[in-house]
């Protein structure tokens, strides 16, 4: 089993548990240059809020889009957009990535902005 398939397997296991609980998820995806965050409905069919470093407004705020500072900006913005729609509590779906570095930075910024998980 290679590194990518192990990550996908971890993500599938976590998503299965969240689907059984029926909670709103804050899903992140990380690449070497960008980070993406989406708030997804419990049934998985609707994206309620989203933010990523690909957006022009966010990429203009940061010097480089693939670091912890950019992840913190994305976390803050996705939390603000979720709170605007009345979403206060979510389950954090890290998509099998380690809770470290940019993933941790995004989560901490979302918590500081008022999102609970």
From Swiss-Prot:
Q: Which GO terms describe its cellular component?
A: cytosolic large ribosomal subunit
Q: Does the keyword Ribosomal protein apply?
A: yes
Gene Ontology MF terms in the entry? 5S rRNA binding; structural constituent of ribosome
Where do transmembrane segments lie in this chain?
none
**Purpose:** This is one of the proteins that bind and probably mediate the attachment of the 5S RNA into the large ribosomal subunit, where it forms part of the central protuberance.
Name the chain's protein.
Large ribosomal subunit protein uL18
Keywords of this protein's UniProt record, alphabetized? Ribonucleoprotein, Ribosomal protein, RNA-binding, rRNA-binding
Query: Which family would the database say this protein is a member of?
Result: Belongs to the universal ribosomal protein uL18 family.
Q: Does the keyword Thylakoid apply?
A: no
Q: Which residues form the signal peptide?
A: none
GO BP terms: translation
State the encoding gene. Answer: rplR
Q: Give the record's subunit note.
A: Part of the 50S ribosomal subunit; part of the 5S rRNA/L5/L18/L25 subcomplex. Contacts the 5S and 23S rRNAs.
What InterPro entries does the entry give? Ribosomal_uL18_bac-type (IPR004389), Ribosomal_uL18_bac/euk (IPR005484)
CDD domains referenced in this protein's UniProt entry, alphabetically: Ribosomal_L18_L5e
Recite the lineage of the species.
Bacteria, Pseudomonadati, Pseudomonadota, Gammaproteobacteria, Pasteurellales
């Amino acid at each position: 089993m290679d590194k990518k398939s192990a990550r996908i397997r971890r993500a599938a296991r976590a998503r299965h548990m969240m689907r059984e609980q029926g909670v709103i998820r804050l899903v992140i995806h990380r690449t070497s240059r960008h980070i993406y965050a989406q708030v997804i409905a419990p049934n998985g069919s609707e994206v309620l809020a989203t933010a990523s470093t690909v957006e022009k407004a966010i990429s203009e705020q940061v010097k480089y889009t693939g670091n912890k500072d950019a992840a913190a900006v994305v976390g803050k913005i996705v939390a603000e957009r979720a709170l605007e729609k009345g979403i206060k509590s979510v389950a954090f779906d890290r998509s099998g990535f380690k809770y470290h570095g940019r993933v941790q930075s995004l989560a901490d910024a979302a918590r500081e902005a008022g999102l609970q998980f």
